[in-house]
Amino acid sequence: MKLKRYFIVWIGVSLMLLTVLLTLFTTMADDGMVWDYQFLFEQVVKHFVTMIFPMCITLISGYMISREYTDDTLKNIETLPISFRKLLAGKLIVSAILSLFLGIVCFVFTVIANFIMGYDGFALIPALTGLVQMALLGFFLYLTMLPIIVLTSRYKGSFLVGVIVAFVYGFIGMFANGTLQSIYPVSAALGLINYRAGAEGVMWNKGLCFISILIMCAIAVSYTHLRAHETAAN
């Protein structure tokens, strides 16, 4: 399978490790905060959403899609019983699976870090909940990045622009609060996994969160159809 040759997937795994290491680095601050498993998990999620994962999944997805242009294999599609639209959809589905996988990888690194640091509070039920939350969070964040991925992977090397845009897009989510946090797609992904629900200042409107991400999906699907028509015309 071609995916096995994509070193960039291993870069994704490395970035998940970086997410946890970056979180552990913040423990060096002498702010009097007592760390336990739950607090570590919440901090990892924060860095996962606002700094690492948006650019990570955009990099991986954009690279896989753009290979058809950089390897000059797109012209060979005409000789195969498969349309460009189906090929693109297949790669987007693979990216969706990878988003779930990377979320799980990040969670595993988080648990390992928790045991290495010797934090209290680890229990089976919260851990299983965290596993599901992190996997779904990766998937929902992928959906929010779909328009960027599809739009910027059209030309050779242009997906790197998408990586930069995705990083800024994710970082801005750090500042969303109030009603805006349920509207802004990146932070809306947190609402769908019920992140810190009930904590001070954290109130989610699940309906708005769902609509926000659904709109991003609709934009991506529309542009995917447009790209397919352009490719067929050429």
Protein language model annotation of sequence segments:
Residues 15-24, 107, 210-223:
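Hydrophobic core of alpha-helical transmembrane segments in multi-pass integral membrane proteins
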Residues 224-231:
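Conserved small/polar residues in nucleotide/adenosyl-binding loops
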Residues 45-67:
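Long, hydrophobic alpha-helical segments
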Residues 1-13, 154-157:
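Aromatic- and glycine-rich beta-strand/loop motifs that create alpha-glucan
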Residues 185-203:
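Short, membrane-exposed interhelical loops at transmembrane-helix boundaries
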Residues 20-53, 89-154:
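Secretory targeting signals
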Residues 64-96:
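Helix-loop-helix units of permease transmembrane domains in multi-pass membrane transporters
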Residues 22-25, 151, 155-191:
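Transmembrane helix segments
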